[in-house]
């Protein structure tokens, strides 16, 4: 992932895709799907407030905009044990986005998709170790505990946006997709986890 995040665009750096895509998803949910929403899904007015809060809160974190996979769940990671190589597949959602979103989204995916279990979300110490290796691989030099802690805070805050993004996406899929999957249930799970961890994650402070 660190190597992918070092891919640069020619010329000026593109704007992150996160807010544009989430706004489009929300608009679709509001205008075309709202009447059919389940009682377990937050009201559209609540979703609109949360989207505004996310943009205001996360935009202040100064997470770098890098080339991201944006959908790095386990099935999109191929490991060649004979060569010790890892490669990623399925770049359908790839694009320039916040570094912390890509990592936070990857951590969220530890919980799985078909049988979601957020007990599998990596613990703080596991994350710190992962982020330490990530920064070292990206920079090629030693990193400080403060740098690791800073990325940890950014990642866990952007993990909130990951929940919100895929919950909106799932509502749309529930309306239009022909895939045999309970997208509505998945949307409810992601929204529930968002609200469950929001207060705790919001309280995280950047290191001085």
Which residues are covered by each model-predicted region?
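A cross-family kinase active-site recognition segment
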Residues: 1-51, 55-66, 86, 93-98, ...
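Amphipathic, non-membrane alpha-helical segments in soluble helical-bundle scaffolds
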Residues: 44, 96, 124, 153-158
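Soluble or luminal CAZymes and related metallo-dependent hydrolases
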Residues: 46, 122-126, 147, 186
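Catalytic-loop of the protein kinase fold
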Residues: 67-69, 74
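Catalytic activation segment of kinase domains across protein kinase-like and atypical kinase folds
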Residues: 75-112
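Active-site activation/catalytic loop segments of kinase-like enzymes and analogous catalytic loops
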Residues: 100-142, 160-178, 193
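All-alpha amphipathic helical-bundle segments outside canonical DNA-binding/catalytic cores
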Residues: 143-159
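Regulatory N- and C-terminal appendages and interdomain linkers associated
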Residues: 173, 177-208
